[in-house]
Amino acid sequence: MEGNARGGGHSEALKNYNLGRTLGIGSFGKVKIAEHKLTGHRVAIKILNRRQMRNMEMEEKAKREIKILRLFIHPHIIRLYEVIYTPTDIYVVMEYCKFGELFDYIVEKGRLQEDEARRIFQQIISGVEYCHRNMVVHRDLKPENLLLDSKYNVKLADFGLSNVMHDGHFLKTSCGSPNYAAPEVISGKLYAGPEVDVWSCGVILYALLCGTLPFDDENIPNLFKKIKGGIYTLPSHLSALARDLIPRMLVVDPMKRITIREIREHQWFQIRLPRYLAVPPPDTAQQAKMIDEDTLQDVVNLGYEKDHVCESLRNRLQNEATVAYYLLLDNRFRATSGYLGADYQESLERNLNRFASSESASSNTRHYLPGSSDPHASGLRPHYPVERKWALGLQSRAQPREIMIEVLKALEDLNVCWKKNGQYNMKCRWSVGYPQATDMLDVNHSFVDDSIIMDNGDVNGRLPAVIKFEIQLYKSRDEKYLLDMQRVTGPQLLFLDFCAAFLTKLRVL
């Protein structure tokens, strides 16, 4: 590794690292390998130039990836260790993946043996499921965004196109590479999110087992035609179970497409499934409560105070101590097993059991947050939990036309201006100039600070004059129709008051 003096002007910001060679160069930055001085472990550092990002309007993409990766701790999602901001650059310190992209691995080896393809696919599904359970849809899953560490384990990366899913809000932005994009995405239709990632996983599984893509054509219109029609062929060398699973994932109708849970339960997926992938995915709230005692002691040995480290970890703070902790933790378990998650989970169970047994002797030996459930129970659950069913909006079995008629009547009664945005989608505007709105505004404003009920961009010392929102009707899997209202701008509490008034006007739901 080269010293800081040769870091190209990054020495002050990256004083805790020795910069090495450049791994890749992009349009608004580069990725370098580096060594963390304190622990000696390698990391990858994205160096993003702020001015170039602004010029290319890519700031939001970078912010989105940082926000998501800060939330996630999973053995098959790339780890974010810290983010360093300077006036000119943003430095994103991430897990280093020695063997690069899965894409290059497939190109080099061609189609994989079924057992190896299954191992990789199991890890991908584990990471994708974790994203979905934390209300994040990746939207750009492809072998180029799947990295391989020193043990050839998969790490989901590049969350720049990802979206946080909100209850009742569909996505419409067309993201990702055309070859891996679902039919509803390239058609510009509204989609909820998870089913899009399922389609991309189906394309990736096909590529792993066949060494080629199911949908490929140099002519983009022809490519789109194949995707929209679900036109592809299954090679004869595929096993019967693989031939059953792939078509279930590549179903054109997203409502009929297999779900992540159903993939998990499929017989092909279950073969040689590692124990740590067979148990429920870890919960981010529970993860923050668990601290590995051995790794904690290693950090203390580096000169950090134990209580300070514990408090920082509990509160998910970024500082030198927590960066060292996670680097040591990841590299410890990566060195002992190809499956980081299995050793990680078993070690945490051992340490947390040790903490629990010594609780009566001293409360200071417990390093998980108060209020948590049995700290070692989650890893011992024998059965996969029932999948959560999200109710997005108001459910009704009435016919769409009948529902929309009642919606329009309610909007008219409340003096709402609306504009058709699609067959069952409309943009609405409600002015606070009307008596009922003014009354609500007075009530809310009397006890709520403006900055609390504003959007970030609306904090200007006064309440906006209007509420803008969208109404959308869509069909669910169980033959029900769901009516959703999504606030765009305006005071949150006033919007909730409007929703209550709107509900009283509806007679069909």
Curated annotation (Swiss-Prot):
Interacts with HDR1. Suppressor of flowering in long days (LD) via the that up-regulation of HD1 and the down-regulation of EHD1. Can phosphorylate HD1 in the presence of HDR1. Disulfide bonds: none annotated. GO terms for molecular function: ATP binding; protein serine kinase activity; protein serine/threonine kinase activity. This is Serine/threonine protein kinase OSK4. Residues 460-508 form the KA1 domain. Strongly expressed in immature seeds. Mostly expressed in panicles, leaf sheaths and roots, and to a lower extent, in germinating seeds and leaf blades. SMART domains: S_TKc. It is an enzyme of class 2 (transferase). It comes from Oryza sativa subsp. japonica (Rice). It is found in: Nucleus.
